[in-house]
Amino acid sequence: MLSKAIQLTKSIYQSFLPAPDTPSTPPGAKGEIQPEKDSAPSGQTDQIDYNKLHTSNAARLVDIEHSSVLVVGANTGEDCREFIDLGASRVDGLDVIDEVGAAFTNERTTYYKQSIERTNLQSNQYDLIFSFATMEHVTDIHAGFTEMARLLKPGGVLYSIAAPLWNSAYGHHMTCFHGHPWVHLVFDRSGILSYANQNGIQGERGHDIVDIVDYMLDLKFFNKRSSAEYLDAAARQRCLSIARNDLEGGDPTLLNHPLGQAVLQRYRSDEILPVVHTLIATKTA
């Protein structure tokens, strides 16, 4: 497989995420292909740094200077850097990649090469658990949210943004298919390759189209879960007081594309339009 497939950076999400609202305050709270930065969606003229925006929003939900933070999906450490810069007293980073934390080290930061589905970390130790553009890669969403809840202190805040969701127009994350919505849901592997050949799609950033398609269809990198499964997995967390558990995003005009019409033969529109799942909650006990 491709040498950097599992190092999924966050920059691709700039093209797919809607501008978020002001963060909700929870009750009781004070693979080996790196997707590249894409242009703003049609109708947007300004590029938003969603990573920085969401770390800032999450930090405002706690007393960050006296808070311990766990970043789930820390990658090489940039999200951890953001929380250190915001003044967090301690930041731990969790990821499955060998290079976890390679780009940022700090005396207040520790990294763990583990999956959020099951860790050996101590329970009830974090004031804030932050996950951005990560849960769509986690096979067992329920196990991931359950583990986050276990690791939170009572009164601690969970802030999770999963995007783009698999069933959304570009849930495969590959920019070379931009303008060809839901190609990954309409066709199987051979069909995608045939469609790419017919439409002059050759791959991206030095990776040929065969490697790109094999990567985006690999369950090791994408969980292929429906948007409803995120809502259900979050709602089943009995120790969390939930401020937000919702779906947003999606451009309904994409359904007018021939691929949009084709995907509607298999899915309802409400199953394929949502791009983002947001979970913001406080641990009650």
At which residue positions do the language-model features occur?
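A short acidic, Gly/Pro-enriched loop at the edge of an enzyme's catalytic core
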Residues: E117-I129
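Conserved alpha-helix/loop element of class I SAM-dependent methyltransferases that forms part
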Residues: Q47-H66, E82
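A short glycine-rich, Lys/Arg-flanked "PGG" loop and its adjoining helix->strand segment in the class I
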Residues: H142-V157
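A C-terminal cap/extension of S-adenosyl-L-methionine-dependent methyltransferases
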Residues: S3-K4, E107, V210-D211, M216-A285
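A short SAM/SAH-binding and catalytic strip from SAM-dependent methyltransferases
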Residues: L128-D140
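Class I SAM-dependent methyltransferase SAM/SAH-binding core
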Residues: N75-R118
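Conserved class I S-adenosyl-L-methionine
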Residues: H66-N75, V157-G200
